[in-house]
Amino acid sequence: MDKSTWTTKVGLAQMLKGGVIMDVVTPEQARIAEEAGAVAVMALERVPADIRAQGGVARMSDPELILAIKEAVTIPVMAKARIGHFVEAQVLEALGIDYIDESEVLTPADEEHHINKHKFRIPFVCGCRNLGEGLRRVAEGAAMLRTKGEAGTGNVVEAVRHARAVYSEIRRLQTMDEDELFTYAKNIQAPYELVRQVAESGRLPVVNFAAGGIATPADAALLMQLGVDGVFVGSGIFKSGDPARRARAIVAATTHYNEPEIIAEVSRGLGEAMVGIEIGKIPRDQLMAGRGW
């Protein structure tokens, strides 16, 4: 079968723009997410909060679980592969998954190489903390980006930091002349043509979602107002007191992110949010966002 072009894969990712993608660990959770208005679900055995709490090596989910979730919903299904583990990605593609997340939430399989995403028919999403990381992933074939944030914490501070870093660097690029763009591209180890494209268009060449620590409707709206194209919500929904209601509220806040009255209304009576973690109290070797390069 012919491989889809990168442009086609970017177009598929564009279809998710403005939406919410939710982590789910059972077919029932996937149905709740779809009914709440999620544009896609991420099939996982453990949400990031449980991966963080339980430790050990986190790998690709069991294909049986992924297929059960795929059969339960009509919206696209994503699944995670370890950084650099191209065979996990091959397995996910064989299962008929719609998108693959080469994810720092799982334990990296290769500490020197990311997956060559151009070799696959289906789109990849990758995390980034800044513009350089994002453009390096795009050069490898990523069709969609997301902030890394700090998954499983219920603390949005790192996602905000990463989103602000990306968009402030884009604004800075627009003030540079050609010589400065060459130097900048060399310094961030990204292709000059991609850097020039971003400087001219004032935006990333692919959609960029927020992820990591989003727990409330206001969190989702905050990232949307900062300029992201949509949000991933992991532990924040199904680790809360009323997952179905919180899921609907986060979808509404993502859609109406510039309307505080609506965000206020949907935020009422949601029950207890997930218990958060202060980033500064996480041991350095347990931080996930630093995985990848």
UniProtKB/Swiss-Prot annotation:
Keyword Lyase in record: yes
This protein's UniProt keywords: Lyase, Pyridoxal phosphate, Schiff base
Catalytic activity: aldehydo-D-ribose 5-phosphate + D-glyceraldehyde 3-phosphate + L-glutamine = pyridoxal 5'-phosphate + L-glutamate + phosphate + 3 H2O + H(+)
CDD domains listed in its UniProt record: pdxS
Residues that hold D-glyceraldehyde 3-phosphate according to the record: 164
InterPro entries named in the record: Aldolase_TIM, PdxS/SNZ, PdxS/SNZ_N, RibuloseP-bd_barrel
Record-level GO BP terms: amino acid metabolic process; pyridoxal phosphate biosynthetic process; pyridoxine biosynthetic process
Pathway where it operates: Cofactor biosynthesis; pyridoxal 5'-phosphate biosynthesis
GO MF annotations in UniProt: pyridoxal 5'-phosphate synthase (glutamine hydrolysing) activity
Sites where the protein binds D-ribose 5-phosphate: 23, 152, 213, 234-235
Active-site residues per Swiss-Prot or TrEMBL entry: 80
UniProt KW Cell membrane keyword: no
PANTHER family from the UniProt entry: PYRIDOXAL 5'-PHOSPHATE SYNTHASE SUBUNIT SNZ1-RELATED (PTHR31829:SF0)
Family that this chain belongs to: Belongs to the PdxS/SNZ family.
Quaternary structure, from the entry: In the presence of PdxT, forms a dodecamer of heterodimers.
Protein name: Pyridoxal 5'-phosphate synthase subunit PdxS
Gene: pdxS
